Structures are given as C-alpha cells and as structure tokens.
C-alpha cells in the first residue's frame, strides 16, 4: 500500500514537471499558476505551457512572432508579459479567447504596424504597453475591442505621426495616456473632452506646434518635464515640442505654471523666449491675406476641364475652401478635386459653373475672400431644315478623331460618298452637294475619307459640323520605280552619253536658226493662232469651297437642279494633305 502511494506521488510530480517548460520557473499558489521564463533564450512561446496559467512572463528572450496557437484556450490568463523580445509579427486573432486578460506588455520589441485584427478578443484589457517599438501606423479600429475598459495606454518611443484619435476620444475610463517621443504634429479638436478620468497626459518630445483648447484642460497642471502628480488633478507634459506661440496657445499660457523651462520655437520675434515669461498680449495671430487667385482659362467650353488656383498667407496658416457661383460649398467628388494648397480642379464643367467662384481663406484671426470668374461657352446646337432644334450628328470634328467613328456610322455614310478612278496616287470622290444646309462654307476631307460640311449655325452664330459621308477603298499597286544604274555602265559609257548630248544640242541650235531664217524670208505669212480648249481644273489642298466652284471654267451644259447636283474631289495620295480637284 505504501509503495502504491509512493508511485502515485512520483507520477504526479513527473506530470507537473512536464507542464513546466525547461529552464522556466513555475509557481503554484492555489488557485493561481504563475510561469516565469525570463532570459531563457526562448525562440517561441513554449507549447507545453499550462493552459490554466494565470500570469505568464516571457521577458528578455528572442521570440520573433506571436502565433495563433501560442495562447489558444488560455481563458484564465490575466497578465501576459512579452517585453524585450524581437517580436515583429502578431498573427491575426492571436489573442482571441483571452477574455480574462487584463494587462498586455509588449514594450521593447520590433512591431511596426498594429492592424485591426491583431488585438481582437481582448474585451477586458485595462493595461496596454507598446512603448519602445517601431510602430508608425495604427489602424482606426485596432482599439475598438477594449475602448471602454482601457485604463493605461503607453505608446511612447515609437514613430507615430498620428493616432486613431476617434478611438482615443471614446476611452472614457483611461487614467494615463503616454505618447511621448513620437512624431505627432496634430491633435484633433475635442479629443480629450470626454476623458474625465484622465490624470496624466504626456506629450513630451513630439512635433506639436500647437495644442487645441479643451474644456478638460481648464483645471490642468502643466509640466515641462514628467513628474509625479496628485491623482485628483490632470497633469499635462508637453516639453520638447516646437511650440508656435500665437493666439492659439493663449489658453495654455493662462493655465497654472510650475516652472519656466519651456521655450517658444516661433514666430521669429518670440524664438527661444520662455513660454511662461511672455506676456499674453504677445500671443497674437495675423488675419489671412489672399496673394493669388486665378483661373487657367477664363473661357471654357462646356464639358471641358478647368483649374482654379488660390493662395493665402497668415498666422496661423489659413485653410482654403471654394464656393460655387450659387454659393454652395465645393467638396471632393468625381467632378471636382480640392487640394490642400488651395487648387481646385473641375474635371467636367457645366453651364451652372459660369460665374464667380469664391476663394475663402480662414484662420483664427479672420476670413478673406476673392472671386475668380469663369465664363462658360455652351456647345453648339444644330438646326434642321424645319427650323427645330435637334441633336448634332455623331461625326468627326478633326483628323485626329476620325479613327474613333463607329462601324455603323461608316456604313451609313458610305452610300452617300463614292470613289472612282483609283490609281496608285489619286482617287476621285463624289458626294451630294448638301444644298439644303444653309451657310455651308467649305467641305473638309479627312484621311479616313469622311466628308464634313462646315457651316454657320443660325441660332448660336457658331461654327457647326456635319458628316456628309465616309468611304473606304484601297489604291492600286504602285508601278516599279527606276532602278539604280549599275556601276559597270559608268565610266566610258557616261563620256559617250555626254558627248552625244552636246552634238544633239548643236544640231537643235542649227535647226532653230534655219526656221527663223525661213520665217523672216517668207514675209507676211499668216499668223498662227493658238486656241485654248479642254477642261480646266484647280488643285485645292485639304479643303474645298462648297458654295461655289471658283477658278473653274464654266460648263456650257444646261444647269442641273440643286437637289441633284453632286460634288467631286480628286485626292492625290502622295501629298501630306489630300489635293482635291473640284469638278462641278
């Protein structure tokens, strides 16, 4: 019997020894279990940790990551310390299930980003220590799990430029907020209004130039260096910031001071002066002054884009916004883009944009406005032969857009424009005269061989364009060009050719002299008369006169009716622009 009891005790001791990792200290003080594994050279969280552990300390090791399985089912864990390791990664939901955890210490690691899913499950967390890391970004919802329970938040000695201020503003139970030695340059207005239990706010050694006034600071004690303070009064530490001493910090100057160690960094006349020694009258601001307001182009065609610019100066730097001609405030959307430097881009203009845009510059000292005028040019409306408004025909406005026409449009207009007499260098194009369109000034032929009628619109007095038709064709293959003379024909052959040319020239000169001699000797012969005949045509480059055929010989045929009259153009394809022969 005694031997059986001894065996049971031995097996129990061995079982407990297996649950405690090597080189770790396991302390069992009923009903709690504490596991201490400091400076043991751990590379990861030991998998043999008792799942009923209440306090787990793994400080001064070489753990590089927190895995999802490391703290699985450890629902009794209350205090977790992972300080001074080399942790750079936290797996998503790595702390899920730790509903009893009250304190998490991860200072002195290599964390760079805190994502929203890395701290999930810590619904009862009260102390979060993340100081001495390399954190430069914290997602907005990272603290949402414990925003109502957190009491101590330490983010000191990181690379933070901003914080999830909206989440911090909801931490109504927080007592200590430590944000010193970061790169923070802005604090949202009203961030601390609801933090009535806040006892200590440490903003030492950041890049703050100003602090927003807050009702919570009315009874605050201001310190330039962290010191002990009573629990009943808020202590604000802001030493080591490049304070800009203007009217925005006048509220801080009126608070109770404890020493004269803090100085101003700007403006220039207050540089290096003790903050608390400056008179209240010297904390002044300058109203905004608009130095530049202009538009890239004052006249804008409807649908085009335009850029408006506005610059202003003042102390503090004024914020710039714009108002439409109807007085509405301009916001960023798919049509308008407003930049921080005061530039406004309108990507697509409408007729409602015609008028005066107002640039408004404002700061703590006042408001300044300036008007920028934009004149909208409406798109031309086409008129049919009945005098009623109609939509413009979808067509090409210039050569560069000719390739954008759809195949359906090409098929529709190809029946109205015909091509004939195709050669390697030219083609003759026929199209209707379009006499029913009033005021046609010319016909424009483009590289895609689409004929456009350009005329004056009767209502808007603007130039309108209508596609008469398009045609597609292929020219005939070009004949072979002259080949280069082989080298064997040069030399003596060239001398013979040159000599022949000289002899021929002498013979021609002799024949001319003989003809002149006979002409003078004939005396009184009939004078030869030249008779001009044949068709005369004029080359016109790129565009033709649609109203009349100038510089052409009038035909003796009877005139045709206007409805049946056709136009014709000869296109010389070797030219950079088409050369047209107008035949009416």
Curated annotation (Swiss-Prot):
Domain of life: Eukaryota
Residue stretches spanning the membrane: 495-515
Signal peptide boundaries: 1-17
GO CC terms of this entry: membrane; synapse
Pfam families in the cross-refs: Ig_3 (PF13927), LRR_8 (PF13855)
Topological type in the membrane: Single-pass type I membrane protein
Disulfide cross-links: 310-359
Locations listed in the record: Membrane; Synapse
UniProt biased composition (Low complexity): 397-409
Mapped LRR repeat ranges: 52-73, 76-97, 100-121, 124-145, 149-170, 173-194, 197-218
Region annotation Disordered: where it falls in the sequence: 393-414, 539-564
Keywords from the UniProt entry: Disulfide bond, Glycoprotein, Immunoglobulin domain, Leucine-rich repeat, Membrane, Repeat, Signal, Synapse, Transmembrane, Transmembrane helix
Ranges of residues in domain LRRNT: 18-51
Cytoplasmic side: 516-584
Keyword GTP-binding appears in the UniProt entry: no
Extracellular domain ranges by topology: 18-494
Residues covered by the LRRCT domain: 241-287
Key word Hydrolase present: no
Family under the similarity heading: Belongs to the LRFN family.
Protein name: Leucine-rich repeat and fibronectin type III domain-containing protein 1
Lineage: Eukaryota, Metazoa, Chordata, Craniata, Vertebrata
């Amino acid at each position: 019997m005694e031997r059986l009891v001894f065996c049971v005790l031995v097996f129990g001791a061995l079982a407990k020894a297996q649950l405690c990792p090597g080189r770790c200290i396991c302390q069992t003080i009923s009903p709690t279990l504490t596991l201490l594994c400091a400076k043991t050279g751990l590379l990861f969280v030991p998998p043999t940790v008792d799942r009923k552990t209440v306090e787990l300390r793994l400080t001064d090791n070489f753990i590089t990551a927190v895995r999802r399985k490391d703290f699985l089912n450890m629902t009794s864990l209350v205090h977790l310390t992972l300080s001074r390791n080399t942790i750079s990664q936290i797996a998503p939901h790595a702390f899920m299930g730790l509903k009893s955890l009250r304190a998490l210490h991860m200072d002195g690691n290599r964390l760079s980003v805190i994502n929203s899913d890395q701290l999930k499950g810590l619904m009862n967390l009260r102390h979060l220590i993340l100081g001495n890391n390399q954190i430069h970004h914290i997602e907005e919802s990272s603290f949402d799990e414990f925003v109502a329970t957190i009491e101590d938040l330490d983010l000191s000695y990181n690379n933070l430029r901003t914080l999830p201020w909206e989440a911090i503003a909801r931490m109504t139970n927080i007592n200590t907020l430590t944000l010193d030695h970061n790169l923070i340059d802005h604090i949202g207005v009203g961030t601390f209004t609801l933090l009535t239990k806040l006892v200590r706010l440490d903003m030492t050694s950041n890049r703050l130039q100003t602090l927003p006034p807050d009702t919570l600071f009315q009874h605050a004690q201001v310190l330039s260096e962290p010191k002990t303070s009573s629990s009943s009064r808020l202590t604000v530490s802001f030493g080591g910031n490049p304070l800009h001493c203007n009217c925005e910090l006048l509220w801080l100057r009126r608070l109770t001071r404890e020493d004269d160690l803090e100085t101003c960094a700007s403006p220039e006349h207050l540089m290096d002066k003790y903050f608390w020694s400056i008179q209240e009258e010297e904390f002044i601001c300058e109203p905004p002054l608009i130095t530049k307001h202009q538009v890239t182009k004052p006249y804008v065609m409807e649908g085009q884009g335009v850029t408006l610019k506005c610059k202003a100066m003042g102390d503090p730097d004024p914020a710039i916004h714009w108002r439409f001609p109807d007085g509405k405030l301009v916001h960023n959307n798919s049509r308008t883009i407003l930049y921080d430097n005061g530039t406004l881009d309108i990507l697509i203009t409408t007729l409602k944009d015609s008028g005066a845009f107002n640039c408004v510059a404002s700061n703590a000292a006042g408001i300044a406005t300036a008007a920028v005028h934009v004149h909208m040019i409406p798109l031309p409306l086409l008129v049919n032969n009945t005098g009623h408004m109609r939509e413009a025909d979808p067509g090409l406005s210039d050569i560069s857009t000719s390739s954008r026409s759809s195949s359906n449009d090409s098929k529709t207009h190809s029946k109205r424009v015909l091509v004939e007499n195709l050669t390697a260098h030219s083609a003759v194009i026929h199209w209707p005269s379009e006499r029913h369109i009033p005021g046609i000034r010319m016909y424009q032929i483009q590289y895609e061989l689409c004929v456009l009628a350009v005329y004056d619109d009767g209502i808007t007095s603007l130039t309108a364009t209508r596609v008469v038709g398009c045609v597609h064709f292929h020219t005939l293959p070009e004949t072979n060009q002259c080949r280069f003379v082989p080298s064997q024909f040069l030399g003596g052959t060239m001398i013979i050719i040159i000599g022949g040319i000289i002899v021929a020239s002498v013979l021609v000169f002799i024949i001319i002299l003989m003809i002149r001699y006979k002409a003078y000797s004939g005396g009184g012969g009939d004078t030869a008369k030249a008779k001009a005949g044949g068709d005369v045509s004029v080359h016109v480059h790129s565009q033709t006169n649609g109203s009349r055929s100038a510089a052409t010989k009038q035909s003796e045929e009877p005139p045709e009716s206007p409805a049946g009259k056709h136009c014709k153009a000869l296109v010389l394809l070797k030219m950079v622009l088409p050369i047209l022969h107008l035949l009416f």
